[in-house]
Swiss-Prot record:
It comes from Thermus thermophilus (strain ATCC BAA-163 / DSM 7039 / HB27). It comes from the Bacteria. This is Glycine cleavage system H protein. It holds the Pfam family GCV_H. The glycine cleavage system is composed of four proteins: P, T, L and H. CDD domains: GCS_H (cd06848). GO terms for biological process: glycine decarboxylation via glycine cleavage system. Residues 22-104 form the Lipoyl-binding domain. The glycine cleavage system catalyzes the degradation of glycine. The H protein shuttles the methylamine group of glycine from the P protein to the T protein. GO terms for cellular component: cytoplasm; glycine cleavage complex. Binds 1 lipoyl cofactor covalently. Keywords: Lipoyl. Its cofactor is (R)-lipoate. The keyword Transmembrane does not apply.
Length: 128
């Protein structure tokens, strides 16, 4: 299971990658593998203000649908429109082309409350 060390993670299997004053968000390799083949992604609206832990998107697979939660509070500033035509990018490249949304955090310091790669690995091991 791939867990890049350059980003933060949540216990609900989202990742958050700081880029300047924004944060790119997607789901982890573990999450996409558990979901199976992704067939649709319901993207949030740009401009929407969200709270940490709020359900902001939905990923639907052949097996199930799963809410995607905001890792920190902030404003959605961009969504990955490529997922409308090719939702399978979430499976093929969960840490790259399969990102879901970008938000501008209310406070970048909130990222410190998230897990690092080692902490996320421990979560996965406790769920196994």
């Amino acid at each position: 299971m791939d867990i890049p060390k350059d980003r933060f993670y949540t216990k609900t299997h989202e990742w958050a990658l700081p880029e300047g004053d924004t944060v790119l968000v997607g789901i982890t390799d573990y999450a996409q593998d558990a979901l199976g083949d992704v067939v649709y992604v319901e993207l949030p609206e740009v401009g929407r203000v969200v709270e940490k832990g709020e359900a902001v998107a939905v990923v639907e697979s052949v097996k199930t649908a799963s809410d995607i939660y905001a890792p920190v509070a902030g404003e959605i500033v961009e969504v990955n429109l490529a997922l409308e035509k090719t939702p399978e990018l979430v499976n093929q490249d969960p840490y790259g082309e399969g990102w879901i949304f970008r938000l501008k955090p209310r406070d970048m310091g909130d990222l410190d409350e998230l897990l690092d790669a080692e902490g996320y690995q421990e979560v996965l091991e406790s769920e196994a």
